[in-house]
Regions:
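Terminal alpha-helical anchor/extension segments at protein ends
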Residues: 1-76
Length: 76
């Protein structure tokens, strides 16, 4: 399926209602920079998954900008 990586792409996916699942690293959750995106995603019915940056999946997500979204459909 389609995936969005990084803050801007994830934000766009949420804005379009295309995000089915938003995945965020725990460090990005703590810094608060994505709080509005997370709130909007939950309000629009998307699942929000937090990955620990202490483990490999979270480390890989950090390498991709700390956020990603699995999409219901392709955008842009």
């Amino acid at each position: 399926g389609a995936v969005a990586y990084g803050d801007l792409e994830v934000r766009d996916a949420v804005d379009f209602g295309a995000a089915e699942t938003v995945i965020i690293s725990d460090s990005r959750l703590r810094d608060g920079s994505l709080s509005h995106t997370i709130e909007d995603a939950e309000r629009l019915g998307a699942a929000v998954v937090v990955l620990s940056s202490e483990f490999e999946p979270g480390k890989r997500l950090e390498g991709l900008g700390g956020s990603a979204a699995l999409l219901r459909y392709k955008i842009g």
